[in-house]
């Protein structure tokens, strides 16, 4: 079965410029902040970041000179087996329980797990449902 945990991500927007990703990640590295998950993209002249770290307070403090307004949001981190089709039952499970997925990002590699970061309309309920019911849908947890 898939495993889900509730955690916090930092979310912020900033004026986009060439080298912005390098500035953000170098600032975090120099401050000793370990990045667990990250999504970054641009729309026109704005850069948007979602970052989960081992110490969000430290990350927020380190970025204050670049990003005066970073907010923490609840998100779900879901780990499940890395094979074709394992995201579909999780998405159906959430939808069938009237939980809307606001956004998701994630990654898989050559290893045995997929990690997805979800924001939903009811994160606490989503975690409970995924942890309780995903095995019945054929979604195995890694390891």
Mark where each language-model region is.
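A conserved regulatory-domain signal marking ACT and ACT-like small-molecule sensing domains
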Residues: 1-143
């Amino acid at each position: 079965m898939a495993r889900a945990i509730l955690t916090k991500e930092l979310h912020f927007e900033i004026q986009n410029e060439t080298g912005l990703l390098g500035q953000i990640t170098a600032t975090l590295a120099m401050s000793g902040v370990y990045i667990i998950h990250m999504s970054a993209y641009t729309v026109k002249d704005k850069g948007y970041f979602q970052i989960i770290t081992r110490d969000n307070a430290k990350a927020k403090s380190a970025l204050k000179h670049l990003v005066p307004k970073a907010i923490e949001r609840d998100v779900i981190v879901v780990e499940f087996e890395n094979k074709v089709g394992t995201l579909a039952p999780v998405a159906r499970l959430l939808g069938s329980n009237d939980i809307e997925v606001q956004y998701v990002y994630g990654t898989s590699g050559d290893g045995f797990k997929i990690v997805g970061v979800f924001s939903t309309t009811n994160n606490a309920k989503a975690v409970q449902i995924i942890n309780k019911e995903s095995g019945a849908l054929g979604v195995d947890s890694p390891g």
